[in-house]
């Protein structure tokens, strides 16, 4: 069930398509299950599930991935972050996941807990993503020797000190990361930096694409989300009085432009859609990826 590895063995020149589906904040999973089935029809290779991003509690990423895998038969990849669990909880979760055939992971350090809840909730951060990769690497030699876990890391191409990011990518590769998913790409500078990472490390890169659907959506992401560098040029393409359709169309157009500029060197694309608007995917990749 090493589906992410198998997905790369597909047609030469074909890009791997991953789509992020956020687990629900409550227990109603109808929307996420509908989205998963729609993504299956759209020819998506991998579905990924974030691990309570921005410190907001969501349904467990591994359990959600397990249900989606069981019901759709799709390749799934939960994110696991270092914010909420110590090494015992982490190893225990990895063992349980493996027993349930979940053995592809995106390993990230995790966002800090928002200041609002910080008084009542303590972050763990016993280790960062490289430390967690080393734990999985050890487990791959021991418990998982017959069927090792495949894992990748994140690239934050917008990091102020780019040299540091480049070194982090190399460290993650040394710790066994076999692919990377980037923060959403919006500018030519982002693209140049990813190209440099590719040239200097040979890393397998899935380029992050986050299509905004309105000026409000784009402005919120620019101001509130760490690691997402939304340029003024992107903002200027949205108007406050756009219809829902016009907003989506603008997001689709920008996504296509980013794909055109990166297709010569990236290995695939990693989409996250605001407000679960996964129907936009077909209009972005069309038939050219089948």
Predicted regions: what they are:
Residues 17-23, 47-49, 76-80, 105-107, ...:
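Hydrophobic faces of well-ordered beta-strands that scaffold small-molecule active sites
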Residues 16-31, 76-88, 149-164, 240-253:
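Active-site mouth loops of central-metabolism enzymes
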Residues 7, 28-29, 55-67, 86-92, ...:
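Active-site-adjacent beta->alpha loops and helix N-cap segments on the catalytic face
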Residues 208-264:
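Catalytic-face loop-and-helix region of soluble metabolic enzyme cores
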Residues 1-4:
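Short, small-residue-biased leader/transition segments that mark boundaries at the very start
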Residues 246-288:
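C-terminal extensions of enzymes
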Residues 34-50, 174-176:
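Catalytic domains of carbohydrate-active enzymes, especially glycoside hydrolases
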């Amino acid at each position: 069930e090493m589906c992410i590895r198998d997905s790369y063995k597909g047609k030469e020149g074909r890009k791997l398509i991953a789509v992020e589906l956020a687990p629900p904040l409550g227990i109603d999973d109808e929307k996420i299950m509908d989205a998963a089935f729609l993504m299956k029809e759209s020819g998506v290779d991998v579905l990924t599930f974030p691990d309570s991003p921005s410190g907001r509690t969501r349904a467990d990423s591994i359990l959600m991935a397990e249900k989606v895998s069981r019901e759709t038969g799709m390749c799934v990849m939960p994110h696991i972050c270092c914010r909420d669990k110590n090494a015992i909880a982490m190893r225990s979760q990895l063992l349980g996941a493996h027993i349930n055939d979940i053995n592809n992971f995106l390993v990230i350090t995790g966002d800090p807990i928002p200041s609002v809840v910080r008084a009542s909730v303590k972050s763990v951060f016993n280790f960062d993503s490289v430390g967690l990769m080393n734990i999985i690497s050890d487990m791959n030699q021991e418990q998982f020797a017959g069927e090792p876990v495949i894992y990748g890391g994140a690239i934050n191409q917008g990091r102020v000190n780019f040299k540091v990011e480049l070194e982090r990518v190399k460290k993650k590769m040394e710790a066994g990361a076999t692919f990377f998913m980037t923060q959403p790409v919006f500018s030519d500078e982002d693209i140049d930096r990813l190209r440099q990472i590719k040239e200097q490390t040979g890393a397998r890169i899935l380029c992050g694409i986050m299509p905004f659907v309105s000026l409000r959506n784009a402005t919120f992401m620019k101001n509130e989300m760490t690691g997402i560098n939304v340029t003024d040029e992107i903002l200027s393409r949205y108007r406050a009085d756009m219809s829902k359709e016009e907003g989506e169309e603008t997001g689709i157009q920008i996504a296509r432009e980013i794909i055109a500029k990166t297709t010569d060197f990236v290995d695939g694309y990693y989409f996250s859609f605001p407000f679960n608007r996964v129907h936009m995917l077909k209009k972005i990749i069309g038939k050219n990826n089948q």
